[in-house]
Amino acid sequence: MDAATLTYDTLRFAEFEDFPETSEPVWILGRKYSIFTEKDEILSDVASRLWFTYRRNFPAIGGTGPTSDTGWGCMLRCGQMIFAQALVCRHLGRDWRWTQRKRQPDSYFNVLNAFLDRKDSYYSIHQIAQMGVGEGKSIGQWYGPNTVAQVLKKLAVFDTWSSLAVHIAMDNTVVMEEIRRLCRANLPCAGAAALPTDSERHCNGFPAGAEVTNRPSAWRPLVLLIPLRLGLTDINEAYVETLKHCFMMPQSLGVIGGKPNSAHYFIGYVGEELIYLDPHTTQPAVELTDSCFIPDESFHCQHPPSRMGIGELDPSIAVGFFCKTEEDFNDWCQQVKKLSQLGGALPMFELVEQQPSHLACQDVLNLSLDSSDVERLERFFDSEDEDFEILSL
């Protein structure tokens, strides 16, 4: 439990275990590396992911609520990380790399702004926690992978700069026809009146200089999140190889999930170990200067990432993929179909062209779900919460 509530001030990065000397390839979000010849490239790739951890001394959530998420916000932070990776792929590309003390493009700061711990950032801990209240989750209550996915989907509607099509595949089924219809739709931003004013936009996820347009496009970039349960109390070994292959796909956003007492953002694997970013470090909240300069070093993991055995993974997870173009989606579909040919491996989800007749829940496609929709969906996945324990403050 102590390891789950480390503070940034006392954290010794030298204590983190380095990668093992192995001939096994290292897979990080669709990229393959050799530990012998590409160690620096591996660490650079890991350091370039946005790392969101517990924070303290941020503005009170809701004005009178918590000023720290230590002990309860780890799944929310993991949701931020997987969604931030989607925005990085959307605006910077998968091959973009962060370098300490090197000037980054404006789009990078625009993405980072969207996740700062302030009420007017689109995907802030404040927005996620308060949106969760509307879905029956009190502030400080544990979120399972499905719950945080549902909340992020609702928040994405307001992010017209990114213009993402967010689809959450329920019942372990991905329906290609529904996704194509969603991504080809040119829907106006629901709740546009709630967007920040021009004077506010330079300090949040919809900043000055970010191009926002209503011009129609053939395909809105897809964020596909698939909540899954890969066993009762432990992960079924028959899913392990399929899970590994998800990290090999170029469209991979990783996996959110974890083990009892903690949630993690899994970004790859080596051998029989998963590689993950751990949110269980408490850092001071970042304060913006008058010029809105963001001290960003604490948002990047500059030490070897954590690892855990695949068998330790709690079976409740959400797998994420990003398809910027329709060609990306078609390629992803072909790769998923090939997974069925893995000997001795079970598919984690089903890919179908049209919705099966036994699935009648059309509401999951709505960009703006009402509370009854989400409550119905969460009842199906309530079991995901029971296997996690809430960390004490």
From Swiss-Prot:
SUPFAM superfamilies: Cysteine proteinases. Inhibited by N-ethylmaleimide. Redox-regulated during autophagy since reducing conditions activate ATG4A whereas an oxidizing environment such as the presence of H(2)O(2) inhibits its activity. The cysteine protease activity compounds is inhibited by styrylquinoline compounds 4-28 and LV-320. Pfam families: ATG4_LIR (PF20166), Peptidase_C54 (PF03416). Disulfide bonds join 292-361. Its main location: cytoplasm. It is found in: Cytoplasm; Cytoplasm, Cytosol; Cytoplasmic vesicle, Autophagosome; Endoplasmic reticulum. One of its GO terms (molecular function) is cysteine-type peptidase activity. It catalyses: [protein]-C-terminal L-amino acid-glycyl-phosphatidylethanolamide + H2O = [protein]-C-terminal L-amino acid-glycine + a 1,2-diacyl-sn-glycero-3-phosphoethanolamine; [protein]-C-terminal L-amino acid-glycyl-phosphatidylserine + H2O = [protein]-C-terminal L-amino acid-glycine + a 1,2-diacyl-sn-glycero-3-phospho-L-serine. The modification N-acetylmethionine is found at residue 1. The active site is at residues 74, 278, 280. One of its GO terms (cellular component) is autophagosome. A motif (LIR) lies at residues 388-391. GO terms for biological process: autophagosome assembly; autophagy; cellular response to starvation; microautophagy; mitophagy; otolith mineralization completed early in development; protein delipidation; protein transport. Keywords: Acetylation, Autophagy, Cytoplasm, Cytoplasmic vesicle, Disulfide bond, Endoplasmic reticulum, Glycoprotein, Hydrolase, Isopeptide bond, Mitochondrion, Phosphoprotein, Protease, Protein transport, S-nitrosylation, Thiol protease, Transport, Ubl conjugation, Ubl conjugation pathway. The modification S-nitrosocysteine is found at residues 189, 292, 301. The modification Phosphoserine is found at residues 34, 316, 383, 392. Disruption phenotype: Mice develop normally but are born at a slightly lower ratio than the expected Mendelian rate. Cells display systemic reduction of autophagic activity, characterized by defective proteolytic processing of ATG8 family proteins, compromising the rate of autophagosome maturation. Mice show severe balance disorders, which are caused by defects in the development of otoconia. The central nervous system (CNS) of mutant mice also displays amorphous globular bodies in the neuropil of the deep cerebellar nuclei and adjacent vestibular nuclei. Phosphorylation at Ser-383 and Ser-392 promotes autophagy by increasing protein delipidation activity without affecting proteolytic activation of ATG8 proteins. Phosphorylation at Ser-316 by ULK1 inhibits autophagy by decreasing both proteolytic activation and delipidation activities. Phosphorylation at Ser-316 is dephosphorylated by protein phosphatase 2A (PP2A). Phosphorylation at Ser-34 by AKT2 promotes its hydrolase activity, leading to increased proteolytic activation and delipidation of ATG8 family proteins. Ubiquitinated by RNF5, leading to its degradation by the proteasome. It is an enzyme of class 3 (hydrolase). Its EC number is 3.4.22.-. Cysteine protease that plays a key role in autophagy by mediating both proteolytic activation and delipidation of ATG8 family proteins. Required for canonical autophagy (macroautophagy), non-canonical autophagy as well as for mitophagy. The protease activity is required for proteolytic activation of ATG8 family proteins: cleaves the C-terminal amino acid of ATG8 proteins MAP1LC3A, MAP1LC3B, MAP1LC3C, GABARAPL1, GABARAPL2 and GABARAP, to reveal a C-terminal glycine. Belongs to the peptidase C54 family. Interacts with PFKP; promoting phosphorylation of ATG4B at Ser-34. Interacts with GBP7. The LIR motif (LC3-interacting region) is required for the interaction with ATG8 family proteins MAP1LC3A, MAP1LC3B, MAP1LC3C and GABARAPL1. Required for proteolytic activation and delipidation of ATG8 proteins. This is Cysteine protease ATG4B.
